[in-house]
């Protein structure tokens, strides 16, 4: 995709309908609010506190259709969800047939501990990854002007996400992708 923001947009468009409730970290990534407003989704903020992190109990008691979360390095608070918290959220999504949009923002930069397995990876090990959309960006790890993002979706959403991507922008610039592939190979 043309960056993580486009990947988030595609994921939300593929899974939610106007009026659906989505839980979003507060404070959090402000650009996601613009996407939610544009799609006319019902935004419900979930507090993120210093050192404590996301209010997991609010999520677990919600009947929202989706949760947008940055579990590895929450922006802007910098908190991280541990494995137990991630598993609780995965269980919530499966029980409620809700979606988790996991924005793996800055997960490569961990200084206090080893990186945790992504929620999408954990769910896959349990056979429950059909409710998680994993979003990433190469802009943070490579260089900001790259504007290449990606999303990993359940098989059931691949065709719909490709259709949305094609309708929005057609192909992502292939020479940028090819240059990155050459860089990675070297």
Ranges and model annotations:
Residues 131-186:
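PLP-dependent aminotransferase class I/II
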